[in-house]
Regions:
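Hydrophobic/aromatic residues within well-ordered alpha-helical segments
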Residues: 10, 53, 60, 64, ...
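Amphipathic alpha-helical packing segments from all-alpha helical-bundle domains
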Residues: 69-70, 104-114, 121-148, 155-158, ...
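Generic hydrophobic, amphipathic alpha-helix propensity
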Residues: 9-19, 35, 60-64, 68, ...
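Hydrophobic/aromatic-rich alpha-helical bundle segments in the mid-to-C-terminal region
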Residues: 126-131, 146-193
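Helix-turn-helix
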Residues: 13, 21-59
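N-terminal intrinsically disordered/low-complexity leader segments
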Residues: 1-9
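Solvent-exposed, amphipathic alpha-helical segments
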Residues: 13, 17-25, 71, 75-78, ...
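Hydrophobic alpha-helical connector segments
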Residues: 70-110, 157-160
Length: 193
């Protein structure tokens, strides 16, 4: 299972490729052939380094999630020295919940993300990963709010996340061209200055 440096690099290239495909096209885009082609590796490498497509997909989700958490942590550290405006906090929270790709507005990035989140419920192999990563996201969100003098407990945090999710789902149902803007408006009203 690839214990060598070369093997580790190849495995990581497959994970990177699968994560890119996941971001671009959701779970349906993560296929052995597509991942191998994106990574520039032979098709057989996907089954050599991963026992199943589910294992590869799980590695892609974890890789993407950890990268987003690391980016969120860096942004929080960068913003710590800046003036503390509610709008900055809201954008950070929305990046963590909706993904930075949603910043440019538009329906597609948010729709794809929510399809992936809801679709995870149909992929039981992702449940342990999602459960294990949720506290990390909650911790970063809680710390973000606290640094902006808006301390919340876990129940309050879950209500804010549900508020964002509700605003986004309503916007998606209505084919709103900018669901992030709808979530921004609701979140600003909830935590405003």
């Amino acid at each position: 299972m690839g214990g060598t440096s070369k093997g580790e690099r190849r495995r990581q290239a497959l994970v990177d490729a699968a994560a890119e495909l996941l971001r671009e096209g959701g779970f349906d885009a993560v296929r052995h052939r597509a991942v191998a082609e994106r990574a520039g590796l032979p098709l057989a490498s996907t089954t050599y380094y991963f026992g199943s497509l589910e294992e590869l997909g799980c590695a892609a989700v974890e890789h993407s999630s950890r990268a987003e958490l690391a980016t969120g942590r860096r942004r929080l550290d960068e913003l710590a020295s800046a003036p503390r405006a509610a709008a900055e906090l809201v954008e950070l929270v929305l990046d963590l919940l909706l993904g930075a790709e949603s910043r440019g507005g538009g329906l597609d990035a948010v729709l794809l993300r929510y399809e992936q989140l809801v679709g995870a419920g149909r992929r039981p192999y992702l449940a342990p990963l999602m459960r294990s990563m949720r506290p990390e996201l909650d911790e970063l969100l809680t710390e973000s709010l606290a640094r902006y003098d808006r301390a919340v407990d876990l129940d309050e945090l879950r209500r804010l996340v549900a508020l964002v999710d509700g605003a986004v789902v309503s916007a998606l149902i209505e084919a709103d061209p900018d669901p992030r803007a709808a979530a921004r408006q609701m979140l600003l009203a909830a935590i405003g200055d």
